[in-house]
Amino acid sequence: KNITGYSNYYIPICGKSGKPEFNLWFMDSNNTFYDTDISAYDIIHRDQIDWYEQASAKLRKENKGAPLPALLFQHIPVLEEYELMRKAKPWEMWKAVRGFGHLRKNWYVLKDKDNGYLAEGPCSPDVNSGQFESWKKMGDVKGAFFGHDHMNNIAGEVDGILLAQCKTSGFWAYTDGGRPSVRLVTVHEDGSFETSVHSFKDFALDCTCLGPIEKRITDRQSVNATIAAYALGVGAITAAVMLGAGKACQSFKNRRK
């Protein structure tokens, strides 16, 4: 159909009866926003949401009036993913991540330590187009899976819907040291599903494209080390400047005597 994006579609999964028992939604979350001063990344547009709601209503009607249980996959995560987190306390800053876009002034940690690995602030759009609320309205989406943020594999429920990140699985884009992974999603005929993460190292594989240090530290540790080095550098420069200023001031006083 003539709607925003190139890959908005769904795939019904039939059970033993030959009738659809489950559904998989695939949405095109596009690329950059038309005005990057407002938002770096694009949104799911209103015409895409309308298409989803119309198709969901059609599937509901064909399913005797009950929502057809579904999972949804798209690249850019929804802004509601930040509801899996809370603002970091001062003593938690060492493990916190900086928010993205209009949330950049805040630092976050996961609310639940069992929600996976958070290594960077989710790079969601700064504009909330109402996609998540649309899922709640239609009642069919049980879980949504995202890419985009290469180092995160967090997963947790927001208002009864699982929001899960899929970490990068390769080494050619920025990644998390030797820890790329895949997320396995298993759907059962009763409409339930489960998901798990399996990393490159779980399979006892050795990456030949990473150096010995890169294999042993995560990107997050590398970022922390860079921040620490920068902080030490700034501290040293500040101390040197202050010391130099102090000496200059003393010299000036001596000359005045």
Regions found by a protein language model. Name each.
Residues 254-257:
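Intrinsically disordered, highly charged
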Residues 20-22, 65-70, 139-143, 159-161:
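Loop/turn elements at helix/coil->beta-strand transitions in domains of secreted/extracellular proteins
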Residues 1-67, 95-97, 184-186:
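Extended active-site neighborhood of metal-dependent phosphoesterases/phosphodiesterases
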Residues 227-252:
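Hydrophobic alpha-helical topogenic segments used for membrane insertion/localization
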Residues 10-18, 116-117, 122-138, 150-229:
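Binuclear metal-dependent phosphoesterase catalytic core
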